[in-house]
C-alpha cells in the first residue's frame, strides 16, 4: 500500500515537472524532487507575510517544508547572498554571515493519522548557528548530507536596511483610458537624512500580488529632484486590474467553503473537486475579500500540526476546443506565483476541458486562471477571468542600492501599496 501511495504521488508530481536537471541562473522558490512539498518561507510565524525582515531586528525568517516519507532524511541547508536580480553575488561567506554555513536541520516531526506520510522540517534565521550581516537578497539551499552538491530545494528571502521613504498611489487612469481594465502605479522615493544616491546606483523592482511574470525591473525615474526620485512611466507602470482571487478552504473535510464543489475519499486519498473555471468577460466588477494569492496551511479537525493531511485538488477550465495560441495556468502562492510545468493545465479532448491535479496540504488557498500567450513571459487574466480597474491588488516595491565601486546590492527599501488605499 505504501508503495502504491508513493507511486500515485510521484505520478502527480512528475506530471507537474518537479524533476529539474539544474539550478536556474536566477534563484527562485523552486523544488527539484517530488519528495518535497508545501515549502514555505515567511516572516516570523505569519504564513501570510512575505519573507522580508529588517536588519538587526528581532524578526526571524521561518523556513518549513514536508519530506514525503516517514523515514528520517539527513537534510541540511546552506545560505548564499544574491544580487538584486537573484543571481549569485560575488561575495565570500565571511562577508555576509557569521557561523556555520552547512547546518543540519534538527527540528522535525512525523505525520500521524494522515493519508499521505511526511516528515515536516523547519528552522528559523538567524539562529545560534547563522548570523546574517548584510542587507539584500538571500537564497536557502536544501540538500541531503549524503549528496551535498545535489540541491533539493531553493527558497528566497530578503533583509531590508531602510534608508528611504516611499509614497505611492494606484489610479484607474492609464494610457488605455480612464476606468478601463488597467491600473497605473505612481510612486516617489525620498532619501532619508544623511543618505543620497544617483539613479544609476539604484535598482527598482515592482510586483503585483508577488507575481513574477508581470514584474517590472530596473525602471528609470521619470523626474529627478534634489532629495527624491519620481516614477510615473505610463508605459511600464500599467498593470491589468484583473479580478479578485478565487478561494478554497479545505481546512475541514466536511465544512469546506469557497469554490469547492465536493470533497470525496477515493482510496487512498481525499480529493477536492473545484467548481469549473469560467471567463467573466463583460461582467461588472464584484468585490470579494481575498488575500491576493496567498495560502495558509492549517486544519480545524485535528489535534496537532502532525495530523494536517494532504488532498489531491482538481482544477478544470471547460473549453470546446483548446487554445492553440498559448497555455492556461493556475497561479497562486502555493507555487510561488510562477508559470511553469508545476501549474500548467492540460487539455482533455474527451471531457473538453483543461485540467490540473495538485497535491496540496489542507488549508486555505487563493488562485486564479492565467493565460500565457505563446512566446511571451507575461500572462493575462483578461481572456480567462476578466479584468477591472477597481480590483483590489497589492503592489510590492523593492529598492536596491549599490554605490559606485560597491561590492553588493543593499535592499534599502521595501514597500507594499494597496490599490484601494
Regions found by a protein language model. Give the residues of each.
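Low-complexity, Pro/Ser/Thr- and charge-rich linker/hinge segments at domain boundaries
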Residues: 159-182, 388-412
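Bacterial Sec-dependent N-terminal signal peptides
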Residues: 1-25
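Basic K/R-rich, polyanion-interacting modules in nucleoproteins and related proteins
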Residues: 274-324, 411-421
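Short acidic/polar inter-strand loop motif in beta-rich domains
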Residues: 84-86, 130, 144-152, 211, ...
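Aromatic-rich carbohydrate-binding modules that target alpha-glucans
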Residues: 97-121, 212-221, 314-362, 374-403
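Contiguous beta-strand segments within globular domains
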Residues: 33-81, 178-189, 300-315
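Ligand-binding face of N-terminal immunoglobulin V-set domains in extracellular IgSF glycoproteins
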Residues: 115-145
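Short, compositionally biased P/S/T/A/G/V-rich stretches that sit at domain boundaries
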Residues: 20-55, 161-176, 289-302
